[in-house]
Amino acid sequence: MNQDDFRKLLATPKAETSQLKNFSSNKSQRLVFGRKHKTAKLEAPRALIKRKQLSHSTSSDITRHSNAKNSGKDTQFYEEPSSKQDIELHKLHEKLRNGQITTKEYSEKSKELGGDLNTTHLVRGLDRKLLEKVRSNELALDDSLLSSSEKEVDEEADKLLEKVAEESSHPESVSILEEKKKIPLYPNGQPKYRKILENGKKVKYLLDENGEILKRLVKKEKKLKNDNERLENEHRTEKLNVNANSLGKSFVKHDIPLPPVDLKLDIFEEVGEYDPFHENDKEPAELKAKDAFQLKGHHELDAPYHKKVFDTNQYSDLKPTNFMSQIHRLAKVQERKEEEERKKGKDGQIVDAGFGLVLSKDDTADIHELGESDDDDNVKRRKTKG
């Protein structure tokens, strides 16, 4: 079966209607015993009605396509135009396809199809001539409203732009206007300064409101110093001159001398002597009186040999005034240590035997050193005999 045969089948719906009639007649002839049969409505289902509509539409489309092929025209389907405007638009479209009209002519003529240009604002679209007149009037009004001062400002701005373009053409002077920070402007729109590179150096020009140069500022390059000592000194002076710069005064560093120190001065003169064992309380009153007498600078007539040595020596000022008292103390400390060692030795020899008995080491040694007595031997013999 070809496509043409299939289309013919779709175009002939008579077989379906005949089948429906036979189907409905068979249903009507049937009888049901015991009750009345309702008369069946002879209506086709919705699906069959839709099929009929589709078959009619496809058949009409097929005929149109076949006519287009036979005529040699494009196979594209066009609906029948409903008005004169649509017919003219269709003709314009065909002319544009054939290359008889350009796209501009096509757009202009399609706009004119709504009516004459004099009456389009009343019917459809806009009056383009009227718009052109209004725009021309607005431009004339803008020119008249502009004051003479504003015109001068615009002219100066144009001149500055020309200068910048000339400078950018030279490789030595490159403008640095394109920076992250925005350049401040005057109320009339003029920049307050301008930056330019000249011979590898940044140059800043301060400008007036009229764009005239007031000052020319050049940024100097700092020379690096290799000496570490100079850099350290500069760092110190910067720290010292922070307060001086804020007050507007020059600060000078002065070397302040330290006060003189008396090396002979005894800083522990009023504190007294260190006495951990509190021996001064037990000393006799005579020794204390002698120490006090020596502190005052007096010496006994029958002084010992070591005192005479200090008196005759050239370093007599450094002699200890309480030399004897120190010797007595050291002797007492030594005696106490010896007594404590003796007590510890005695404590080690004593043994607690229990029941309040305390035995010395000598007694316990005798007990352990003794061997078995004769009585013990006799007892063992008796046991063996018995």
From Swiss-Prot:
Stored InterPro entries: Red-like, RED_N
Keyword Nucleus in annotation: yes
Residue span of region Disordered: 1-28, 46-85, 366-386
Skewed-composition ranges (Polar residues): 15-28
Compartmental location: Nucleus
One GO term of the biological process aspect: meiotic cell cycle
Species: Schizosaccharomyces pombe (strain 972 / ATCC 24843) (Fission yeast)
Major location (coarse): nucleus
Spans through the membrane: none
GO annotations of cellular component type: nucleus
The protein's name in its UniProt record: Meiotic chromosome segregation protein C1539.02
Function, as annotated: Required for meiotic chromosome segregation.
Keyword Signal tagged: no
UniProt keyword annotations, A-Z: Cell cycle, Meiosis, Nucleus
